A protein has these predicted regions:
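Active-site beta->alpha N-cap acidic-glycine motif
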Residues: 38-140, 144-157, 164-166, 231, ...
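Bacterial N-terminal signal peptides that target proteins for export
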Residues: 2-15
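Alpha-helical scaffold elements lining the catalytic groove of polysaccharide deacetylases
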Residues: 82, 131-158, 175-221, 234-237
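Short secondary-structure boundary segments
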Residues: 195-196, 228-229, 256-257
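Boundary at the C-terminal end of the N-terminal hydrophobic targeting segment
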Residues: 27-35
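Bacterial N-terminal signal peptides
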Residues: 16-25
Length: 263
């Protein structure tokens, strides 16, 4: 039998450790971060009891963020023509974001959803088909919400339950109702509004969107920012936006549920 020297054992253990680094998404991401990358400054665990509804554009309160802290959120994806470019830009700057996804797009593009999760982003919920829920019956609205949640959790975890793995939700068009807000609070699902947005649903160039969102961000001095990863101009301007955050001294905060996910 071949004897093993201490040096050979160490070499083998070193190789195993290197393989672990290669196969672990989080470790791989850290290894690839540039020294001058924007990065994610901290992680904020959101408590549904303390902050059941956040975003000053819709609600009285927002997340407990410091001056020049931002939370990046993207709605309506995943979409093959644009979401990969958004993910590439975030990965290049080692930034984590939150994606409020549509169940219909999740079913059509499951690999993109899996990529969002594997790269460390928070995957949250935005209904099945983007219906404005204040224009339909309470039962139909709840079914629209639950169908979207089920699509996400089935793709990512192989099953779904009444409470989503990530209990974050945003109403399409911010079209909520008191009854739906109460139902979501009862289920301990945090409802996200926004503190500002890029207005990227309007036709504009990437440069125009960049100027607009930076102006609003400077005026607000931080907050929850709403983009759409389905918009080409947003995907195109995002690298410059992230670099501008770095230059202007903004810091990115990554939001996660306070209660650990139970897939």
């Amino acid at each position: 039998m071949t004897s093993l020297t201490l040096s050979s054992v160490l070499r083998r253990r070193s190789c195993v450790f290197c393989l672990w680094l290669i196969l672990t998404p989080g470790a791989q991401g850290r290894a690839e971060c540039r020294a001058d990358a924007l990065g994610t400054s901290r992680v904020l665990a959101v408590d549904p009891t303390a902050t059941p509804r956040v975003g000053r554009k819709q609600f009285p309160a927002t997340l407990p963020l410091g001056t020049r802290e931002v939370v990046l959120t993207f709605d309506d994806g995943p979409w093959p023509g644009t979401t990969p470019h958004v993910l590439d830009a975030l990965r290049s700057e080692c930034v984590k974001a939150t994606f409020f996804v549509l169940g219909s797009n999740v079913v059509a593009h499951p690999d993109l959803l899996r990529r969002e999760l594997s790269e460390g982003h928070t995957v949250a919920h935005h209904t099945w088909s983007h219906r404005l829920l204040n224009r339909t019956s309470l039962a139909a609205a709840q079914a629209e919400i639950d169908r979207g949640i089920a699509a996400v959790d089935d793709v990512l975890y192989g099953k779904h339950e009444a409470k989503p793995v990530t209990p974050f939700f945003r109403f399409p068009g911010f079209a909520s109702s008191p009854a739906l807000l109460d139902r979501l609070a009862y289920r301990r699902i945090v409802v996200f509004g926004a503190d500002l947005w890029a207005s990227d649903w309007k036709p504009m160039s990437p440069d125009a969107e960049l100027r607009l969102v930076l102006k609003r961000l400077e005026q607000a001095r931080g907050g929850i920012v709403l983009f759409h990863d389905t918009k080409r101009q947003t995907a195109a301007m995002l690298p410059a936006f992230l670099r501008a955050l770095k230059v202007r001294g903004f810091r990115v905060v990554h939001v996660i549920p306070r209660e650990p996910p139970q897939p």
